UniProtKB/Swiss-Prot annotation:
<keyword id="KW-0007">Acetylation</keyword>
<protein>
    <recommendedName>
        <fullName>Photosystem II CP43 reaction center protein</fullName>
    </recommendedName>
</protein>
<comment type="similarity">
    <text>Belongs to the PsbB/PsbC family. PsbC subfamily.</text>
</comment>
<feature type="transmembrane region" description="Helical">
    <location>
        <begin position="134"/>
        <end position="155"/>
    </location>
</feature>
<feature type="transmembrane region" description="Helical">
    <location>
        <begin position="447"/>
        <end position="471"/>
    </location>
</feature>
<feature type="binding site">
    <location>
        <position position="367"/>
    </location>
    <ligand>
        <name>[CaMn4O5] cluster</name>
    </ligand>
</feature>
<dbReference type="Pfam" id="PF00421">
    <property type="entry name" value="PSII"/>
</dbReference>
<keyword id="KW-0604">Photosystem II</keyword>
<keyword id="KW-0479">Metal-binding</keyword>
<dbReference type="InterPro" id="IPR036001">
    <property type="entry name" value="PS_II_antenna-like_sf"/>
</dbReference>
<dbReference type="GO" id="GO:0009523">
    <property type="term" value="C:photosystem II"/>
</dbReference>
<comment type="subunit">
    <text>PSII is composed of 1 copy each of membrane proteins PsbA, PsbB, PsbC, PsbD, PsbE, PsbF, PsbH, PsbI, PsbJ, PsbK, PsbL, PsbM, PsbT, PsbX, PsbY, PsbZ, Psb30/Ycf12, at least 3 peripheral proteins of the oxygen-evolving complex and a large number of cofactors. It forms dimeric complexes.</text>
</comment>
<feature type="transmembrane region" description="Helical">
    <location>
        <begin position="255"/>
        <end position="275"/>
    </location>
</feature>
<feature type="modified residue" description="Phosphothreonine">
    <location>
        <position position="15"/>
    </location>
</feature>
<keyword id="KW-0597">Phosphoprotein</keyword>
<keyword id="KW-0148">Chlorophyll</keyword>
<dbReference type="InterPro" id="IPR000932">
    <property type="entry name" value="PS_antenna-like"/>
</dbReference>
């Protein structure tokens, strides 16, 4: 009878601060950790920690599947993806599923399949997580020594690192297989406004691939974010996958050298801090990639980049006024510079006006109109295609400059659509997450180094403020 809600609601609420709940191994008295530091109780329980990790993976994959199906259910084929707040379907479309010429979505069934596969996978992971958290052995060392470990066992840790690297390498080869053998990927640069194509000749020249790493991150250089063709993208995945797999084999077969044993802190919290630093770096790179790059993140799905929307505005009005009889090659603007076209400091012909700052934009709808010295005046007069006009007008009104209340667009564009671009969502979220992961890295690295030096064991729990507070009931 006690379990009936009608009876139970009158009983006092017990909190973990009371010490009266008999939860051996889960309360502060028996573990030394308060409720909010729950993960710390699993530091030396490899079986339970495995359960936590598998369950976490299940939550991640469940989100991916559920959000995928949610986006499929809400998708309207007549509207561009970027106007519908989608962040998962653009990734699937970029991989070449369900897409036709010009980025038109011709089939949503592959997206449905993707969502269902992720949901089924999440159920398997969820079951495994619950099993290992509640039923399986607390520690793996006795029953399954291959999966067991001690945090300070340097050789075992680098073996685990090696296994992870091999899995990452296999993952890096998946887009390679899709691009080369399984239908190809979407190429925004394909003639006529983009199409799905197989990448038959990936760039394997190391000077081309590693040249990106040696570029400046600033200005027109743009480090790896400046990649502008799928041959280099897929070739980079071949190199990265190979390096990860060979590096993984190396770390499995070798023991850490003396300099590495001295240089690193070898504890669970130290490994956590290294992982957080890596994820932080990934977040910052992803932020820049999705904001600036329109090859890996095609504008057909993610909307235009900021510079792209600005240049599209200049192009749209050049087209309009040229039709009305303006001499776009010689017309002066209010500052005495060219109204439609001007010269960059190095002599190329570029769009005039405020968009001059984005003169080095490269976009598939604009490149056909360039000559050896910037924009080609005769091409602008004779060769502009209807699809280029349509696309630039669309991009002009969909700049990725939305604020939280969706009042967005280029400030000088009265026709701007009120929406928040997926580029805004993805770049902002990855920057913020990257920043907080970096703070987490500093926090855990500091604690791990202090613990290794022997002068910091965490907060002194005898004087923790919560211990002197009145229980909540």
């Amino acid at each position: 009878m006690k379990t009936l809600y009608s009876l139970r609601r009158s009983y006092p609420v017990e909190t973990l601060f009371n010490g009266t709940i008999a939860l051996a191994g889960r309360d502060q008295e028996t573990t030394g950790f308060a409720w909010w530091a729950g993960n710390a109780r699993l530091i030396n329980l490899s079986g339970k920690l495995l359960g936590a990790h598998v369950a976490h993976a299940g939550l991640i994959v469940f989100w991916a599947g559920a959000m995928n199906l949610f986006e499929v259910a809400h998708f309207v084929p007549e509207k561009p993806m970027y106007e519908q707040g989608l962040i998962l379907l653009p990734h699937l479309a970029t991989l070449g599923w369900g897409v036709g010429p010009g980025g038109e979505i011709v089939d949503t069934f592959p997206y449905f399949v993707s969502g269902v596969l992720h949901l089924i996978s999440s159920a398997v992971l969820g079951f495994g997580g619950i099993y290992h958290a509640l039923i399986g052995p607390e520690t793996l060392e006795e029953s399954f020594p291959f999966f067991g470990y001690v945090w300070k066992d340097r050789n075992k840790m680098t073996t685990i690192l090696g296994i992870h690297l091999i899995l990452l390498g296999v993952g890096a080869f998946l887009p390679v297989l899709k691009a080369l053998y399984f239908g190809g990927v979407y190429d925004t640069w394909a003639p006529g406004g983009g199409d799905v194509r197989k990448i038959t000749n990936p760039t394997l020249n190391p000077s081309a691939i590693f040249g990106y790493l040696l570029k400046s991150p600033f200005g027109g250089e743009g480090w790896i974010v400046s990649v502008d063709n799928l041959e280099d993208v897929i070739g980079g995945h071949v190199w990265l996958g190979s390096i990860c797999i060979f590096g993984g084999i190396w770390h499995i077969l070798t023991k850490p050298f003396a300099w590495a044993r001295r240089a690193f802190v070898w504890s669970g919290e130290a490994y956590l801090s290294y992982s957080l630093a890596a994820l932080s770096l990934f977040g910052f790179i992803a932020c820049c990639f999705v904001w600036f790059n329109n090859t890996v993140y095609p504008s057909e799905f993610y909307g235009p980049t900021g510079p792209e929307a600005s240049q599209a505005q200049a192009f749209t009005f050049l087209v309009r006024d040229q039709r009305l009889g303006a001499s776009v090659g010689s017309a002066q603007g209010p500052t005495g510079l060219g109204k439609y076209l001007m010269r960059s400091p190095t002599g190329e012909i570029i769009f005039g006006g405020e968009t001059m700052r984005f003169w080095d934009l490269r976009a598939p709808w604009l490149e056909p109109l360039r000559g050896p010295n910037g924009l080609d005046l005769s091409k602008l007069r004779k060769d502009i295609q209807p699809w280029q006009e349509r696309r630039s007008a669309e991009y002009m009104t969909h700049a990725p400059l939305g604020s939280l209340n969706s009042v967005g667009g280029v400030a000088t564009e009265i026709n701007a659509v009120n929406y928040v671009s997926p580029r805004s969502w993805l770049s902002t979220s990855h920057f913020v997450l990257g920043f907080f992961f970096f703070v987490g890295h500093l926090w855990h690295a500091g604690r791990a180094r202090a613990a290794a030096a022997g002068f910091e064991k965490g907060i002194d729990r005898d004087f923790e403020p919560v211990l002197s507070m009145t229980p909540l009931n």
